[in-house]
Amino acid sequence: MSEALPADNLVDRLAELDWKLIPYTPYPAHMHMALDEVLLERVIAGARGPTVRFWEWSEPALVIGSHQSVRNEVDVAAARDLGFVITRRMSGGGTMLCEPGRTITYSLYVPATIVSGLSFRQSYAALDAWAVGSFAALGVPATYREINDIISPRGKIAGAAQARRRGFVLHHTTIAHAMDPSLLPKLIRVGRDRLS
């Protein structure tokens, strides 16, 4: 966390917002990607206030970042054979493996002023601080690891990504609470360092 924006200052900024909550609903992967784009645009346009959305996956999916190459990141044949759809999100970051009942994601759609004074890297830690605190409250010894991971002593448990548009931020974090780690090397082409 940056000294320019202490945690209590961020908590104050977040508490001042009139949050809109999107009910927790399972949808197919492509629908979730479309919802992120539409909701961010509606917040930007002033048609809705700052919004938090918790979402469940109705199908297994591999979600790649906006600048990634499907061919370089994903074994397409293995994904097809194992029943995973492949979709692209509007934010950056790496490929996420998402499974119904094993993965939950949340999105925050907020004005960028919430993280003003923070570097791009620091904004990840700031917007995920409540999740790290929630893990701790549940007895999970979670910590933040730059640039966009939440980890426990057993490894990565969540990854975040952001998109910024016209003074607003979409920040979403995917929590893999019961993922089958044996699927990662079968589906995602990553180095061993990313699997730890």
Range-by-range predicted roles:
Residues 76, 96-196:
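Catalytic beta-strand/loop module used to bind and position nucleotide/cofactor moieties
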Residues 83-103:
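Glycine/serine-rich anion-binding loops at beta->alpha junctions
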